[in-house]
């Protein structure tokens, strides 16, 4: 499933971290076509050195009795199709079923700040990041 909105990138993953939705903005920002990522685990986006930490947090969030739908906004390192790691502003939106049980996660990304500029957001995994490119 895709759409034609490219002002933001949106990705929806299920409880197992499998990509279920990928919009045109995600294809534009990250360089991966929807046909290549829908149905796959989201590992391709996660910087390899951060994968273990990412999956620990993701699985813990999805295993909760009730999901917290309010999540902080931050710059997240993303592995683009070109192999370049870029930092994109990211908001997680936890998806709950009708009984407030975890059902998945929506990730909404904005365009990265221009080189040498800051958007004022903190960086996820700051101890391992390189400056934005």
Regions found by a protein language model. Give the residues of each.
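Conserved hydrophobic beta-strand signature of PAS-family and PAS-like sensory domains
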Residues: 18-20
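Terminal output helix/cap of sensory domains in signal transduction proteins
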Residues: 48-82
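PAS/PAS-like sensory domain cap-loop motif
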Residues: 26-37
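Sensory-domain boundary/capping and coupling elements
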Residues: 115-133
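Short hydrophobic secondary-structure edge segments in sensory/regulatory modules of signaling proteins
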Residues: 8-12
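PAS-family sensory/regulatory domains
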Residues: 36-52
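Short loop/turn elements at sensory-signaling interfaces that couple input to output
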Residues: 89-105, 111-119
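Beta-strand residues that line the small-molecule/cofactor-binding core
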Residues: 80, 85-87, 104
């Amino acid at each position: 499933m895709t759409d034609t909105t490219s002002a933001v990138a949106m990705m929806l993953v299920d409880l197992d971290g499998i990509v279920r939705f990928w919009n045109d903005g995600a294809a534009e920002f990250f360089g991966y076509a929807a046909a290549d990522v829908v149905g796959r685990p989201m590992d391709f986006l996660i910087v390899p050195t951060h994968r273990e930490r990412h999956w620990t947090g993701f699985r813990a969030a999805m295993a909760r009795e009730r999901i917290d739908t309010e999540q902080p906004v931050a710059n997240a390192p993303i592995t683009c199709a070109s192999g370049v790691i870029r930092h994109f502003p990211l908001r997680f939106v936890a998806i709950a079923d009708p009984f407030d049980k975890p059902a998945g996660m929506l990730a909404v990304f904005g365009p990265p700040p221009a080189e040498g500029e800051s958007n004022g957001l903190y960086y996820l995994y700051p101890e391992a990041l390189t400056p934005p490119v």
